[in-house]
């Protein structure tokens, strides 16, 4: 008994000496792990240093033996299979993480029988498994599975090929695209394809052998890979080919990637060396970024025959191209090099339908092309047609973010032809346009380009609505523009419209600017009347402490003179205590001290 206990202690000490060797990483066999069984040339084998399977099994099984694990055979309904496609570093069959006596390799099995750990086991072994547990005198033989990696690869390849054929049967137009691979000139199409290697032959966690999926290694040890990949995850999910751009293809991505490669087919224009090669395809080139630039280079050569050929192919689509992100640039270039007859055809084409020119002018791309038409129009007939097409939607055009630029270009290039209908629209819809973000800009342009009676009527209409416009975020700019025209009659009319409301107007954001402009540009008589109204109205203290009103008082101090200035200073001093405790009041006191 003592001798037996001594032997067990010796074996336990031996086991303690064995365990550090298993986990230290020093005694690992040097063997490569292949990321894929594919025949692709881009597959790289990376050396992995893994612990020997036999070392793990022997050490931990013996630990179970000596630490009181019950001597019985766990029940398992599954027979033992050894997958020949994967071997451990020592070329022994893989041993699974679950301790099952019927999953032990033959050497370990006999060793456990010798120490009495597996008594009477022969009755639980099936006849098919007895070949793995032979007596010592007979050599071991491995069960060789009839299924090889090549069979698995071929099966996966055929399944993926069938999916592709089904997809192509639903989308027959892709068959033509595939045939382009055999054409000498292959720059017609550019689409992303899966690598030419058989990526469908990679290890898949769903289709692979169930026994292979159960194999596991300590992830911490597997992280010692020389690659920048988590090797444990690569083994678990299957690894694939590393493509030319460095992307790692995994098996569970292949079907999706193939579908994406078919769906992402994108038609690219053919590259042409001369305009003759592009005959019949000008319309499509005009709508492509590179094709449009190619055609513009042809225009730069100013060859009449080439211009005529391009013109004839796009004239029927001219309105569409004018609103195209790339085509509009070609139309602009065409208008610079075409002759008068061709330009007239373009004008007729874009005005043949009512409202078509308005639609193009309001388009973010079309507005540039229409402006170019306005700039290049020379004949009175052309100008008349353009004006007739624009006049019915002029108010909408003026208020549009893109269309207002066309109207401004008309004022710049088509006067006096367009003056009448433009100024009439401005006068009739003065308040509507003046209070619009874009309309106020066009109205100021109209004031700048108008002359004589037209200008007088327009200014008078604006001045008569001065009180309303002064309080509008956009109308106040139109009113200030009228002040800057320095028309005395217009200034007096505006001052009369605002009189009696200066205190209220001074404490509003928009109208306070108008009051400052009045103090600056009014004559001494009207300036004095404004200041007296501010003092005598009884709310000067509120105006001085107001975020906007304090600027009006500062302007009054700066522009006033004589008795009016003295009255204003005295009124300010009466509120000096409240001004000192208010940030806006301090600004008034600062202006008062600087005036001295």
Swiss-Prot record:
Domain (PUM-HD): residue spans on this chain: 254-596
Keyword Calcium appears in the UniProt entry: no
Family matches, as SUPFAM superfamilies: ARM repeat
Subcellular location field: Cytoplasm; Nucleus
One GO term describing the cellular component: cytoplasm
A Gene Ontology molecular function term of the record: RNA binding
Pfam families attached to this UniProt entry: PUF
BP terms from Gene Ontology: regulation of translation
Residue ranges of Pumilio repeats: 277-312, 313-348, 349-388, 389-424, 425-460, 461-496, 497-532, 533-570
Keyword set, alphabetical order: Cytoplasm, Nucleus, Repeat, RNA-binding, Translation regulation
Job description of the protein: Sequence-specific RNA-binding protein that regulates translation and mRNA stability by binding the 3'-UTR of target mRNAs.
Domain comment (free text): The pumilio repeats mediate the association with RNA by packing together to form a right-handed superhelix that approximates a half donut. The number as well as the specific sequence of the repeats determine the specificity for target mRNAs.
Name of the protein: Pumilio homolog 12
Species whose genome carries this gene: Arabidopsis thaliana (Mouse-ear cress)
